[in-house]
UniProtKB/Swiss-Prot annotation:
Name assigned to this protein: CinA-like protein
HAMAP family in alphabetical order: CinA_B (MF_00226_B)
InterPro entries: CinA, CinA-like_C, CinA_C, CinA_KH, Competence-induced_CinA, MoaB/Mog-like_dom_sf, MoaB/Mog_dom
Family membership noted in the UniProt record: Belongs to the CinA family.
Transmembrane segments annotated in the record for this chain: none
Length: 413
């Protein structure tokens, strides 16, 4: 089965809105072993939409379109669908009934403009929308099934799962499934990972490997397709074991996890506690830690000590040390970590200090110079890094590197 996606909206072409709908639809179809062969994006132009529908219908079994089903003048998808299929645009009484019921539930009066959303191609079948005003619909164009969904992501997602996917599976008529297992890798480039895993899919028929860079990590996606659920699971687990063997400690998160949730799980399992002292990251690491529910069980405090005086007053970093080595140094990072641990009474304390830029660098300590330190009962260690990129990238990779320090320390507990 060949499927295609059509995203509709001027806001997509202008870069004002990111098209998350297509990604969600493609991923959901892939879970069922259906690969999206093509994707187009067009603006709110009736002729462009109709032309795209006709073009995609010629080479695909199913086309799923999103957007342009609202009540305003620029919502022209239904008219374009009628034009492409040679049908009249008529008032769909079933859609109107759903719309009236929706406003009754809200306790609000329906604006006359909303009635435009019920003008659909003749004999179109409805796709119910339980959370919004725009009904979806589907109809054939030659041998292709055209399906239309609203562009609001939350509405689209419900309609996709409840109606669209079952219809597509019914049309396919077979029961092959695709299962995906994702491992998160940090500290290796995509090229290095690919070289280490180059023979993985060739040595295991039915298994494919794909890579997705989400700076500063790389997602290694293992996919297996077949009819036997048990065989798919076994194939994926075998592939994942080999990835872990070849990439070692660079695999920082398993399927369904991130490096942040992995660290959270390890804190819960070990019963250890944490304090942070941040300078160049300005609380970014603490934000990642506290974004995970339940972090209050192990996270005590974070001191964002941007100024030297704050490092001295809050963390006890000696003024003489700051003057001698500068705030960006291994010695100061270690003093910050020890001070945070003493302040909080935690098992672990991690500190970062660095130059995120774009200003503040020097020949000896250019922009991107970062020191990370970790203190525990046994002592304190520190390491220097030189990260490249703009301010946001430097801060991001510093935070992820810090999370990896915590992950590795907790694994050694």
């Amino acid at each position: 089965m060949k499927t295609a996606l059509l995203s509709i909206g001027d806001e997509l072409l202008l870069g004002e809105v990111v098209d998350t709908n297509s990604a969600r639809i493609a991923a959901r179809l892939a879970d069922e072993g259906i690969v999206t062969a093509r994707k187009l994006t067009v603006g709110d132009d009736e002729g462009e939409i109709a032309g795209a529908l006709e073009e995609l219908a010629r080479g695909h079994d199913v086309v799923i379109a999103t957007g342009g089903l609202g009540p305003t003048d620029d919502d022209v998808t239904a008219r374009a669908a009628a034009r492409a299929t040679g049908r009249r645009l008529v008032l769909n009484e079933e859609a109107m009934g759903h719309l009236r019921e929706f406003f009754v539930r809200l306790g609000r009066e329906m604006h006359p403009a909303n009635g435009r959303q019920c003008l659909l191609p003749a004999k179109a079948e409805l796709i119910p929308n339980p959370t919004g005003t725009a009904s979806g619909f589907y109809l054939p164009l030659d041998r292709c099934l055209l399906m239309f969904l609203p562009g609001v992501p939350s509405e689209m997602a419900v309609m996709l799962d409840e109606t669209v996917v079952p219809l597509v599976l019914e049309r396919r008529g077979e029961h092959r499934r695709t299962r995906t297992l994702t491992l998160t890798v940090f500290g290796l480039s995509e090229a290095e990972i690919g070289a280490r895993l180059s023979d993985l899919d060739r040595s295991r028929p039915g298994l494919t490997v794909a890579y997705c860079v989400e700076y500063p990590v790389v997602q290694v996606k293992l996919r297996a397709t077949g009819e036997d659920e048990g065989a798919l699971t076994a194939l994926l687990e075998d592939g994942a074991a080999l990835v872990r063997e070849r990439l070692g400690g660079h695999v920082v998160a398993g399927d369904g996890e991130t490096i942040d949730t992995t660290v959270a799980r390890l804190f819960r399992e070990t019963g250890m506690t944490l304090a942070l002292a941040e300078s160049c990251t300005g609380g970014l690491i603490a934000g990642r830690v506290t974004a995970i529910p339940g972090s209050s069980a192990y996270f005590f405090l974070s001191a964002v000590t941007y100024a030297n005086d704050a490092k001295a007053r809050l963390l006890g970093v000696p003024q003489g040390l700051l003057a001698e080595t500068g705030a960006v140094s291994a010695e100061v990072a270690k003093a910050m970590a020890r001070g945070a641990r003493q302040l909080a009474g935690s098992d672990l304390a991690l500190a970062v200090t660095g130059i995120a830029g774009p200003e503040g660098g020097s020949p000896d300590k250019p922009v991107g110079t970062v020191f990370i330190a970790l203190a525990d009962q046994a002592g304190c260690s520190a390491k220097g890094y030189h990260f490249r990129g703009d301010r946001d990238r430097i801060r991001t990779i510093t935070a992820v590197t810090a999370m990896d320090w915590l992950r590795r320390r907790l694994l050694s507990h």
